[in-house]
Amino acid sequence: MRVLALSENIYNRNLSRDEPKFKLWRSAGLMLTYQCNAACEFCYYHCSPRKSGLMPVGTCLDAWRSLQTLAGAAAKIHLTGGEPFLHWDHLVEILAKGKEQGLGSVDLLETNGFWATDDGLIADRLKMLVELGVQRLKISVDPFHQEYVDIEPARRLAATAKRILGPDRVLVRWEKYLGDLRFQISNFRLGERERVYVETYRDYPFRFTGRAAGHLAGLFASKPAAAFRGVDCRAGFLGAKGVHIDPYGNVFSGTCSGIILGNIGQIPLQEIWKAFHPGQIELVRILCERGPFGLLEKARSLGYEELPAYADKCHLCTHIRQFLFERHVEPAVIGPADCYAPSASPPGGRMERQ
């Protein structure tokens, strides 16, 4: 199978041999839905029970096929959400069609394990996944998920999956929380939950984008916007190893949710890669040249008021984009609505959890 050459991208063509190139995307996270049984404070995509969207089988297969065109045998597909197991029959149909069409195996399937309440059901589903070519299962276990998901199904799923799939094919993110009931925080008061949030971030840092740029980011905000002057995102866009594709076909670089590089319903993924140039999309150009601080000029002209402090550059970027989204600025790039809070963030930075 022929793999695309770096020179087939329009940005790379005019670069000297030593200049950093726009890398080939080798992985794609296919977000089957924005719907989730949880609404975790650190979710990059604002997933929740109120959300919807379901990636059509054909869209999923097209993305899968396109990634193979891009990366050949190195292509890695993972299925995520939202929570894919909310749509079990749809998930099975995707996997069955992929196998039928010879698209190879799915590298990773993610779940929070909410459904794993019966040993027989777990075994039946895992055996079906093995038969359909899923290589690894990733189970989300952390204080953020355990605010919504009982730990017992996740434990049961992890134990059964390690027995049926083998321990090397089961990833628990994060294993340390699997046996610790202190982190089942659904009944904690706000102050207690916040203490656990802070401890968790210190153990396993994450970006403050999506819902994480709301209340959670406010717990860590310590730097003024000016502290991020000159901190650009060029390396992040050029060096991204993969993309996420949402249920509607929108393509996001890495984990930069809410910044649309293209839509595979309109243009195949490999053509989006070929046409990507960091200077052609205004928002991306500014981020690559100046970072999120560079977005302030336009935002201020429209009435944006800075927060006293931000947690990181992703917090600054997301907060500004939330403001621009609400004013319908660059809607083809700043979207979709699922990736943004449903209402404006007040001065403290909190965004409504939906």
Task: Give, region by region, the residue ranges found by the protein language model.
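Short cysteine clusters
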Residues: 36, 40-43, 254-256, 314-317
